[in-house]
Design a protein with these regions (language model features):
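Gram-negative bacterial Sec-dependent N-terminal signal peptides
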Residues: 1-20
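Sequence/structural signature of beta-propeller domains
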Residues: 21-379
């Protein structure tokens, strides 16, 4: 099969400047000119880590599975969605208080818990939903479910009211619904993992790895072509689709027959064409590798009319990407990072918060990292 992608645009890796050990509060990390564009530079300063252990209970329900995070400027709190599939408790999101200032991250605590409702106004039945992302939009709370490829349950993006009730649903583009023969559509557990809202109100939704018709999952030697759908946030109608080139798996498992993977686990809009993306990898016997990438969609091809990227002969320009941060490389030991938000500390400090999905596993933890944003791309 023939794939014509403009390789030079696929991945630009520029090393960050590191001022100190990442375990030191105040250590700084700078990517000055990603893509050769110094107006897109980003600088971060480490503010610390806070952990909530697996098994922590809130309102009689186990806390965990944090897969999305977004700052609410009106309250100064963060919304965090759990990927509990209405099994340990109802599908839900939390309002969190993140206590930090320029001196560091002090604590993360639950302010309240809100149950998400289906179209009939009822809590979701068990295994009928898989919440993975959450953002505040202009008319409510935007959240995504990645569906269930095995059960042929389609992914979706919906808008909820503050009380969790259903408001409306975005249109699912052709080619994303799961199929029994796996010829097209989402792969199980690799679907709508990512959600971002741009200043214009446009909404970006990404799949963790390639749709079946677009090619294979990442391997140790090759990457994967993830689609990002751009929606009109006001109407929920798709406007365009882009290709994000997920990197090859960066680390082999400890044993030849053990598992490993890599995928795009979250995106965050910096402006209307630049986003941050989390590439989250796991290798059995090694752990997680977490890299924060900046992507630029300015010259990316709209591939919404291309049914299969694997069988396409047209020239396609994917999103450009440049590495901003490698958490292991700066001395951190990240868990399963799936949540990312910009926000503000109580003293007005601009911050970037990362959060992990503990999979409700006793061998994992709910982990939050905080960074002060010293500089970010200018439009």
């Amino acid at each position: 099969m023939t794939k014509r992608f403009l390789a030079a645009a696929a991945f630009v890796l520029l090393s960050s400047t590191v001022s100190a050990s990442a375990t030191d509060i105040g250590a700084t990390f700078e990517t000055t000119c990603p893509f050769g564009d110094c107006a897109a530079g980003i600088s971060l300063s480490y503010l610390g880590e806070f952990v909530i252990p697996t098994g922590h209970m809130e309102n009689g329900v186990e806390f965990g599975g944090i897969s999305g995070l977004d700052f609410d400027a009106a309250t100064g709190h963060y919304l965090a969605i759990s990927d509990d599939r209405s099994e340990r408790g109802p599908a839900r999101f939390y309002e969190l208080n993140v206590d930090l200032d320029a001196s560091g991250l002090k604590s993360v605590s639950v302010v309240k818990q809100v149950t998400l409702k289906d179209k009939n106004g009822e809590p979701f039945a068990a295994r009928t939903v898989d919440p993975e992302s959450i953002r505040l939009g202009k008319d409510g709370i935007y959240w995504g479910s990645e569906g269930d490829g095995k059960a042929l349950l389609a992914p979706f993006v919906r808008v909820a009211a503050p009380d969790g009730s259903f408001v409306r649903e975005f249109k699912l583009p052709e080619g994303f619904a799961p199929t029994a023969d796996k010829s097209t559509g989402i792969r199980d557990n690799l679907a709508f993992e990512d959600l971002a809202v741009a200043p214009s109100g446009d909404v970006f939704v990404g799949v963790e790895a390639a749709l079946y018709q677009d090619g294979p999952n990442p391997s140790l030697t090759s990457g994967s072509l993830s689609r990002i759908v751009r929606y009109d946030g006001a109407t929920g109608e798709p406007k365009a689709e882009y290709v994000y080139p997920v990197s090859p798996i960066p680390q082999a498992a400890a044993k030849a027959d053990a598992g490993n993977d890599n995928g795009m686990s979250e995106i965050l809009a910096l402006d209307d064409h630049r986003l941050l993306a989390v590439e989250r990898s796991y290798a059995q016997g090694f752990g997680n590798s977490i890299k924060i990438m900046m992507m630029d969609l300015t010259d990316a091809t709209d591939v919404s009319a291309i049914a299969s990227l694997a069988k396409n002969d047209q020239r396609v320009v994917p999103a450009r990407k440049s590495q901003v941060l490698d958490l292991r490389a700066i001395g951190l030991v990240p868990d399963n990072i799936e949540a990312m938000s910009l926000g503000k500390a109580k003293d007005g400090t601009d911050v970037l918060i990362l959060g992990s999905d503990n999979n409700f596993s006793t061998s994992q933890k709910t982990q939050f990292y905080a960074f002060k944003v010293l500089n970010r791309p200018q439009q």
